[in-house]
């Protein structure tokens, strides 16, 4: 009695364990099918509603591992709502589990060809018989549905007696282990098969694309299964897995599927989220790129309301968009850049675009119609001279303060074209006597035009009145060009004019060698071209003046560029003023001694010019006998 009772208890425990394995096999099979046929939550169907499954896998973290995931050593992502559609706990293991994968398509209005274009087989045969049309609640739209897959999981217990008689030969523990291992292999085969069928292509397209499609996949677990007709079943293909033998029967798994060769995307519409319209290089990011032939308008064009502020564009609250002119001016660094135009460089800007402090003095000359100078398209210096004078945008004027003498400073207005000829330089000089004019002229021009090196910006022409061309400074702002309204043009200072009676012998010593640069910007060269000019300068420093200056009412002006930034090419040209100069007489012996010294200086100068500078102008002197 005891042995039979123990045998019955063992059989009951083995049967309970087998039923639990079968129950978990059904649940895991359903989970695998729903996981590969239910779109993620991020995907949307044609109605815009979100799907129910989450893409997070249950095996991603240890806290999310459920007891069911340990079965068959296969963890899947969660599909709670899909699993709720089939209450597997209330179903009997003797009932088959049927899962239909339905493709729901909503064709376009007036378009009935969606069915034919969406599903085709490899041979090109169209499937129309499997579609069912039903109307919505409003009755205005129809939905075409077609079952593209049908999975059947069932437990066949017709050979229970045979299995019981043959199973007595084996131990119960070995039978359960073999059953569990075979069920694990079958589930892994199912996991691979669901990803090889054509419906998985639709599933991936719905999940990976950011589109709202006119079709969707809907897995269903019907309580009442409608069998296929013979025609429908003939159009579908069947695949059956190898059944798993158990102590009470066997587990069977099969699938009916359609051969879908292509899923057309013609019925898809763009997704509703906002597009990035103002990406880099987009016409919407720069409104002027969209309209390259806009007429010239004063001020900045209105920006689009949805445009965002970028680091690569101009601030909408401070400046206008970049210029689209064919001849841009990259050297202007002011924050109020105007919208340039090829034919509008001479037009004045709108009064609202001009700052208050510069509205009166800056733009009338810059946009004057008489100036035919256009800025170069590159920041490099222009290779041609300015045809009509010097524009105010070329170089900043130089402030020439007077030296710290007791007399007042005298400022001489510049000439129209900055002529450096002898007549232009002598124009502001007061009328002298017949005997005094010759000495003054010789004193002014005996040093010559080459006793100091001119800056690179000064280019004397072949005519008697050379003009000066300047290179633009790429780092100069608009405000630097209009600092001093009294000096609109640069001046050129001659070294012999900045000395007086008391400071002539030591003026160059205090200032340094004549060959050293006069200012910190390095505008003047550091060395002369030959030694003859240097010897001439040293002789001029030591030579006493022909006549003594008895009046100190007027002093020459000294050019100072300490306040100017380094690297800016600025040239000063100034003429001496002799309104208060009175000349005194000297002895004849002193005059003859100076005459001999000036002859020697003349010979040195002519010799140096003939060897080093053949194009220099011959210097004449009234003392040439």
From Swiss-Prot:
Residues 322-332, 455-477 have a biased composition (Low complexity). It holds the Pfam family ATG13. Residues 498-518 have a biased composition (Basic and acidic residues). This is Autophagy-related protein 13b. Disruption phenotype: No visible phenotype under normal growth conditions. The double mutant plants atg13a-1 and atg13b-2, or atg13a-2 and atg13b-2 are hypersensitive to nitrogen or carbon starvation and show early senescence. It is found in: Cytoplasmic vesicle, Autophagosome. GO terms for cellular component: Atg1/ULK1 kinase complex; autophagosome; cytoplasmic vesicle. Involved in autophagy in a nutritional condition dependent manner. The ATG1-ATG13 protein kinase complex regulates downstream events required for autophagosome enclosure and/or vacuolar delivery. Becomes a target of autophagy under nutrient starvation. Connects autophagy to plant nutritional status. Gene3D superfamilies: HORMA domain (3.30.900.10). The gene is ATG13B. Residues 322-388, 452-527, 544-564 are annotated as: Disordered.
């Amino acid at each position: 009695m005891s042995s039979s009772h123990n045998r019955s208890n063992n059989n009951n425990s083995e049967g309970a364990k087998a039923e639990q394995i079968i129950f978990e096999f059904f649940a895991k099979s359903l989970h695998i099918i729903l996981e590969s046929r239910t779109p993620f939550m991020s995907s949307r169907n044609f109605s815009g509603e979100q799907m129910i499954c989450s893409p997070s896998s249950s095996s991603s973290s240890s806290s999310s591992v459920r007891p069911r995931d340990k079965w068959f050593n296969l963890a899947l992502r969660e599909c709670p709502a899909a699993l709720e559609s089939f209450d597997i706990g209330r179903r009997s293991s003797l009932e088959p589990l049927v899962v239909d994968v339905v493709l729901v398509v909503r064709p376009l209005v007036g378009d009935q060809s969606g069915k034919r274009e969406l599903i085709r087989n490899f041979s090109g045969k169209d499937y129309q018989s499997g579609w069912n049309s039903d109307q919505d609640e409003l009755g205005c739209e129809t939905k075409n549905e077609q079952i593209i897959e049908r999975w059947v999981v069932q437990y066949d217990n017709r050979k229970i007696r045979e299995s019981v008689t043959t199973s007595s030969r084996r131990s119960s523990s070995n039978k359960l282990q073999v059953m569990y291992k075979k069920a694990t292999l079958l589930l892994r085969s199912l996991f691979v098969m669901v990803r090889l069928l054509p419906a998985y292509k639709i599933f991936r397209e719905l999940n990976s694309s950011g589109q709202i499609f006119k079709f969707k996949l809907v897995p269903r677990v019907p309580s009442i299964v409608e069998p296929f007709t013979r025609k429908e079943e003939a159009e579908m293909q069947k695949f059956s897995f190898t059944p798993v033998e158990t102590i009470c029967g066997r587990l069977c798994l099969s699938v009916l599927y359609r051969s879908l060769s292509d899923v057309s995307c013609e019925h898809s519409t763009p997704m509703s989220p906002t597009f990035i319209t103002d990406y880099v290089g987009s016409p919407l990011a720069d409104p002027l790129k969209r309209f390259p032939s806009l007429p010239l308008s004063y001020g900045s064009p209105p920006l689009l309301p949805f445009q965002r502020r970028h680091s690569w564009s101009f601030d909408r609250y401070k400046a206008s968009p970049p210029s689209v002119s064919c001849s841009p001016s990259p050297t202007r660094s002011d924050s109020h850049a105007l919208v340039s135009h090829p034919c509008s460089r001479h037009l004045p800007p709108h009064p609202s675009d001009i700052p208050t402090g510069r509205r009166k003095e800056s733009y009338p000359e810059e946009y004057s119609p008489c100036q035919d100078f256009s800025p170069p398209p590159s920041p490099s210096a222009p290779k041609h001279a300015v045809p009509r004078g010097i524009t105010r945008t070329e170089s900043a004027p130089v402030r020439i303060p007077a030296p710290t003498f007791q007399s007042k400073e005298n400022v001489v207005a510049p000439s129209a074209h900055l002529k450096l000829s002898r007549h232009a330089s002598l124009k502001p000089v007061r009328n002298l006597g017949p005997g005094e004019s010759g000495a003054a002229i010789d004193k002014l021009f005996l040093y010559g035009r080459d006793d100091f090196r001119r800056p690179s910006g000064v280019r004397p022409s072949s005519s008697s009145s050379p003009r000066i061309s300047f290179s633009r400074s790429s780092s100069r702002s608009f405000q630097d060009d209009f600092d001093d309204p009294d000096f609109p043009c640069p001046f050129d200072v001659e070294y012999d004019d900045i000395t007086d009676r008391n400071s002539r012998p030591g003026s160059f010593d205090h200032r340094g060698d004549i060959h050293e640069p006069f200012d910190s910007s390095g505008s003047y060269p550091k060395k002369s071209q030959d030694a003859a000019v240097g010897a001439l300068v040293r002789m001029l420093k030591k030579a006493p003046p022909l006549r003594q200056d008895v009046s100190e009412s007027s002093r020459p002006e000294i050019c100072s560029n300490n306040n100017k930034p380094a690297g800016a090419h600025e040239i000063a040209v100034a003429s001496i003023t002799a309104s208060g100069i009175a000349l005194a007489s000297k002895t004849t012996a002193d005059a003859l001694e100076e005459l001999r010294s000036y002859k020697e200086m003349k010979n040195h100068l002519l010799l140096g010019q003939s060897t080093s500078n053949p194009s220099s102008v011959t210097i004449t002197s009234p003392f040439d006998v």
